[in-house]
Amino acid sequence: MSSSLQSNRQSLNRKVAVMGYPHVGKSALVLRFTQNIFPERYESTIEDQHSKHIAAFHRDYHLRVTDTAGQQEYTVFPRSCSLDINGFILVYAIDDRKSFEMCSNIYEKIVRTYGDTSIPIVIVGNKTDLSTQRVVRAEEGEELARQWDAKFVEITARESNRVHEVFELLLREIEISRGNLSPTERPNGNSPKRNPFKDDGKPCSIS
């Protein structure tokens, strides 16, 4: 494709939301993806909107990301997540059992709001850099993903490449759900020779 055609190629708009219990690293995940920074100090998020242009699957995307405020119980589903969201990232911390359990509550709210169990979801077990404090096994995240027909990965938001892979995985699921992409296609247009979501030699399913 010529450079003139590439410059005139229109970006496809997609909206995603990042949800989870307080203190699990949602904002760190979003800031690492959109600005390539990692906040060392925790600051409570009310709600932030971010965006990033990315190229994947031979297309250009304008990805709008809603960084939601963490709730203790999620008795009220965020209004910003009730309309026009194409996919969700549900984040828990591997050192926080309550945050993992809260993912089920959030999932139920998503299904109830959208009336659809097939909406693209990626479950993220964050803070693998705190592996010595782990209380949630990777197998538990994998099982939850199987139950929901979702995707599951474990990462640390400190690693930029891994964070980008999470958002590309969700984007891939969104495009598959819209009939725009083959399930075997990856961001570079090739089928992978290895599982791209392995952390320090430990298996992490994409189920």
UniProtKB/Swiss-Prot annotation:
GO CC term (a single one): plasma membrane
Identify the keywords attached in UniProt to this record, alphabetized: Cell membrane, GTP-binding, Hydrolase, Lipoprotein, Magnesium, Membrane, Metal-binding, Methylation, Nucleotide-binding, Prenylation
Q: Which residues are involved in binding Mg(2+)? A: S27, T45
Question: Which sites bind GTP?
Answer: G25, K26, S27, Y42, T45, N126, D129, A157
Region called Disordered, residue ranges: 180-207
Does GTP-binding count among this protein's keywords? yes
What the protein does comes down to:
Binds GTP and exhibits intrinsic GTPase activity.
Family label:
Belongs to the small GTPase superfamily. Rheb family.
| Name of the protein in its database record | GTP-binding protein Rheb homolog 1
Which organism does this sequence originate in?
Answer: Caenorhabditis elegans
